[in-house]
Amino acid sequence: KDEESKTTLVKADVINLAMFEPRKFNVYESADEDVFYINQLVYSSLFKLDKNLNISPDVVSEYSVDTSSGEVNITLKDNVKFSDGSKLDSSDVKASVERIIAAESGSPYFIYASKINRIRINDSRSFTVVFDSASDASLDNLTFPITSAGEYKKGENFAIGSGPYAYAGHESGKTLTLAANKYYYGGVAKLPIVFNIVKDKSVIPGLMTMDVVTAYLNKTVDADAIAQDKKLKYKKIASGELEYLGFNHENKYCSNSKFRIAIAKAIDSNKIIKYNYADAGVTSDSIYYPNFLGAKKMAHLTTNRKKQLSY
């Protein structure tokens, strides 16, 4: 190309995202979806989900599960700090559980913390989580955000956390800014994040073409078509949302295993994924995402119309 048409690439110094103005930013009380995702950036948790939706340690260095007594013994990593430089310790975990329970069903994390009977602290880095029921002694019940025991105030919107980012500023109706947590144990993030607050998310693809927004999450069935139309790069990611078929065994028809098999064989999951979800889905032989907990193989139930009619 000649000099006049030469393209110059400019390195971005900020990540621009988009969000709705939430009703509240409080980590334990907000039910806004955007705030839930922001929580993953601002706060650490004992355990987190990886790209295959498997449970992996976050601020935990060692753990053991006693399923007979319903207890999980945990030792924290030694280098985890909140964004104010203070160390995360056992008392912070205990206080976080108490705050979630105090928020009751208004908290999206209450379903996890409500199963915990108590936190038995051994020292600043080790403690035991005692569950009400032994069957609840599961690591996926320990995926809630951790806040500082001393700094948090009930109902506050921008509590400090120990995640890769920290709240840095909020202009209502306009922007929310996150700065890198310079104490983050996993390494300091290179770029700050600015959330541009919008009233209609349908305008976001257009904002991306103008470089106002760097990236966004699209959960609609035509997400890939929108990306292709706007010439945007996109990547499919795993989701915990699912659809499943359930049977009431008390029903006189559904109590018959042959009847249940006939219905199951009549459903073509691949066609549902293709025509209802524009291929933005996967099949699984359980209610969990494929490869969850190391499951490598799937037991496919082949759709067979003729055999279905024979039951």
Regions found by a protein language model. Give the residues of each.
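N-terminal lobe/hinge region of extracytoplasmic solute-binding protein
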Residues: 18-67, 98, 160
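Short helices/loops that flank or line small-molecule/ion binding pockets
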Residues: 85-86, 201-213, 228-229, 257
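Surface-exposed binding/hinge segments that line
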Residues: 64, 109-152, 171
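Aromatic-rich, solvent-exposed beta-strand/loop patch
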Residues: 83, 130-146, 159-201, 223-241
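Aromatic- and charge-enriched surface segment that lines or borders ligand/interaction sites
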Residues: 61-106, 253
